[in-house]
A protein has these predicted regions:
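Glycine-biased low-complexity/repetitive sequence motifs
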Residues: 1-49, 56-63, 67-420
Length: 420
C-alpha cells in the first residue's frame, strides 16, 4: 500500500503537523474496517456510510487518524466505533458528519479513553482571494491596481476578495471647486473685487493592506466592497462670476459608495459660500461673513473656511477660498488679496499629487498683490484663473477690472486595492 509516514499527522490537503507517529494509508477505504494503531486512513463514503472500529485493548499512546477522502461525510457519515473504550470520556461512538473533516485520536487511559488531539476541515485552510474590478482608467503600481474616474462611471466588483488577500479599497473622493467671484469691472479704487472659490471637499481612506503615503486627512481605514456595481459621481466645478452677476456658483458633489464630498463654496454676494471648503469674502467696504468649510460636517474634515476681510478701506482686495488643509487667506492693505488655502497631497495615484486648493482673491485697483491659488489646483486672482481640471481647485476671484473670475476645477475619484 502507499503510505505517508515519518512521525507526522496529516491534518488536511497537503498540511502536516508533528503530533505523533502515524503512517497514512493512501489507498482509500470504501467500507467498514478495524483500524490499527499508528495508522491513518482516507475514508471514501461516496457510495455509503460505514464504521471505522478502533483497536481493541489499546495502550496509552496508541494513535489513529481518519480523513474524509471525498468530502462526502456530511451526507454519508463516518462512524468511529469505540470498540469497548471511551471516546472523549464518553461510552459513545464518534461520528464525522462534516464535509472534509479529519480527526486524529490518541488513547490516554481507561477514563477518558481516546482523545481527539487534532481536527480540521478543508475549509479551515483559506486561500488568499483578491479584489477584481473594472471601471475608470486602470493603472498598476506594484501589487496594487488604481482606478481613476475623471467623469461619471461605475466601479464594477466581480470578486470581493477575502481578509487573507484583500477585501477593502483605498479611496480619494474630491468634489468640484467653487467658482470665483466677479469684480465690479471698473478701474476704480472703490470697486468691488471677487473672493476666491472654495476647493471641493476632499475625503481619503487608506486600506490597512495598502502602503502608499496618504494625506493628513486620511481616514482610519478604507472601504470594504462586495460584488456589485458602485456608481461613481464626479462633481463639476462651479461657474465663474462676472461683473454682472458677480456671484460664483458652488461646485458639485463627488460620490463613491458611502463617501460623499461636498462641492466647494462659491461666492454668493458679500458672504463666502459654504461647502467642502468655503469661498472667500469679496473685497468691499464691509467685512462680510466667512464661508464655512466642512459643510456638511464629516471626520476627518473635508475642508476649511474661506478667508475673511481684515481691511475694509479702499482699494478693496478680496479674500481667498478655503483649501483641503488650510483656510483661505485674508486681504491686506493697498488692495492686496488673500491667497487660496492649500490643498492635500497624497500618493494614492502612485506619485505625490496635490488636490483641492482654494482660489486666490482678486486684488483692488490699482492692484499690486493678487491672491495666489492654493496648492492643489486653486486658481490665481490676477488674471483670474480657473481651478485646475480634476483637482477640485477653487476658481480665482476677479480684480476690480476686468470683472470676470475663474471657474472651479472639476473633481476626481481614485480607488486603489491590492490585486495580487
Amino acid at each position: 500500500m502507499g503510505v505517508v509516514s515519518c512521525g507526522t499527522t496529516m491534518l488536511d490537503q497537503g498540511v502536516f503537523e508533528n503530533i505523533g507517529a502515524v503512517t497514512w494509508d493512501t489507498t482509500a477505504k470504501t467500507s467498514g474496517f478495524t483500524a490499527v494503531s499508528g495508522n491513518g486512513y482516507f475514508c471514501n463514503t461516496t457510495s455509503s456510510a460505514f464504521t471505522v472500529t478502533l483497536p481493541s485493548s489499546p495502550s496509552a499512546g496508541d494513535i489513529v487518524g481518519i480523513k474524509d477522502y471525498a468530502n462526502t461525510a456530511d451526507t454519508n457519515n463516518i462512524t468511529i466505533g469505540r470498540n469497548g473504550s471511551n471516546i472523549q470520556g464518553q461510552a459513545a461512538d464518534f461520528v464525522i458528519n462534516t464535509e472534509g473533516r479529519s480527526v486524529v485520536l490518541v488513547y490516554v487511559d481507561g477514563t477518558q479513553g481516546w482523545k481527539v488531539t487534532s481536527s480540521s476541515q478543508a475549509t479551515d485552510i483559506v486561500s488568499p482571494q483578491f479584489i477584481t474590478a473594472t471601471g475608470g482608467t486602470v493603472t498598476c503600481c506594484g501589487d496594487f491596481k488604481i482606478h481613476t474616474f475623471t467623469s461619471p462611471g461605475t466601479f464594477c466588483v466581480s470578486n470581493a476578495g477575502n481578509a487573507e488577500g484583500s477585501n477593502s479599497v483605498s479611496y480619494m473622493v474630491v468634489a468640484g471647486g467653487g467658482g470665483g467671484g466677479g469684480g465690479e469691472g471698473v478701474a476704480d479704487p472703490t470697486a468691488v473685487t471677487g473672493g476666491g472659490g472654495g476647493a471641493g471637499g476632499y475625503r481619503e481612506g487608506k486600506a490597512s493592506t495598502d502602503c502608499y503615503t496618504a494625506s493628513p486627512l486620511n481616514a482610519p481605514d478604507g472601504l470594504p466592497v462586495s460584488v456589485q456595481g458602485y456608481p461613481i459621481t464626479v462633481g463639476g466645478g462651479g461657474s465663474a462670476g462676472t461683473s454682472s452677476p458677480r456671484e460664483g456658483a458652488n461646485g458639485s458633489a463627488s460620490i463613491f459608495s458611502s463617501i460623499t464630498s461636498a462641492g466647494g463654496g462659491g461666492t454668493p454676494g458679500i458672504t463666502g459660500g459654504t461647502g467642502g471648503s468655503g469661498g472667500g469674502v469679496r473685497g468691499a467696504c464691509s467685512a462680510g461673513n466667512v464661508g464655512a468649510g466642512n459643510t456638511p460636517p464629516v471626520s476627518p474634515p473635508q475642508g476649511n473656511p474661506g478667508g475673511i476681510l481684515t481691511v475694509t478701506s479702499s482699494p478693496y482686495g478680496a479674500a481667498g477660498g478655503g483649501g483641503a488643509t488650510a483656510a483661505g487667506g485674508t486681504n491686506g492693505p493697498g488692495g492686496a488679496a488673500g491667497t487660496g488655502g492649500n490643498g492635500a497631497t497624497t500618493s494614492i495615484s502612485g506619485s505625490p499629487t496635490a488636490y483641492a486648493g482654494g482660489g486666490g482673491g482678486g486684488d483692488g485697483f490699482p492692484g499690486t498683490t493678487s491672491g495666489a491659488g492654493g496648492t492643489g489646483g486653486g486658481g490665481g486672482g490676477a488674471p483670474p484663473y480657473n481651478g485646475s481640471t480634476n483637482t477640485g481647485g477653487g476658481g480665482g476671484g476677479a480684480p476690480a477690472s476686468p470683472g470676470t473670475a475663474g471657474s472651479g476645477g472639476s473633481g476626481i475619484v481614485i480607488i486603489r486595492y491590492k490585486f495580487q
